[in-house]
Amino acid sequence: MSRTRQVPSNTASSSHIQLLSPAVPQENHSTVRISGTLRLRAENDSIATDHIEGARPGRHIRWTEDVVDNEGLGKKSSKVCCIYHKPRPVGESSSESDDSTSSSSEPESDNDVDCRDSTGRAESHEQNAQDASQSPSNRSLNRGRTPSYTKRHAKRNGKRKPSPNAYEKMPKVKGQPRKTGM
């Protein structure tokens, strides 16, 4: 009766098998070396992968057409590494409210948009432009508000400076003094 035992070796690609006989001494001690490569294959690769990762079978990520290929490496991600603003035609507004559908059936123009004054009354931009042309004392008497309020709203009728993008904007931190200059 003989036993077979596998002896670990230093190389990963070969194994040693040594035959040992029982208490009966034999003159020929032979060592058989078997070398080869063992390749294991799963029956269905996707099922084996899902079980290893702990996910349910049949559950896969499916990317939609609008998912960005970050950095052009063929790796899709739902997180975008850059903030991209699509260029707009010259006459088109850049505000996000123009992109969404409005709930009212009437189109809004700049002159029809309501502004609330300090007393809570709604006024149109057209009225604010008229207020800006009046003297400060007349505006205060006519509307019951300070002249600085009207001046501030009159500036809205003109072109405004473009706001910085998300990378240029510094977050406001409460309780810490603002640093000036870089």
Swiss-Prot record:
Its main location: nucleus. This is Type 1 phosphatases regulator ypi1. Residues 113-128 have a biased composition (Basic and acidic residues). Keywords: Nucleus. Residues 150-162 have a biased composition (Basic residues). It comes from Aspergillus fumigatus (strain CBS 144.89 / FGSC A1163 / CEA10). Belongs to the YPI1 family. Signal peptide: none annotated. One of its GO terms (cellular component) is nucleus. It holds the Pfam family PPI_Ypi1. The keyword tRNA processing does not apply. InterPro entries: PPI_Ypi1. GO terms for molecular function: protein phosphatase 1 binding; protein serine/threonine phosphatase inhibitor activity. Residues 1-18, 129-149 have a biased composition (Polar residues). Regulator of type 1 phosphatases which maintains protein phosphatase activity under strict control. Residues 1-30, 76-182 are annotated as: Disordered. It is found in: Nucleus.
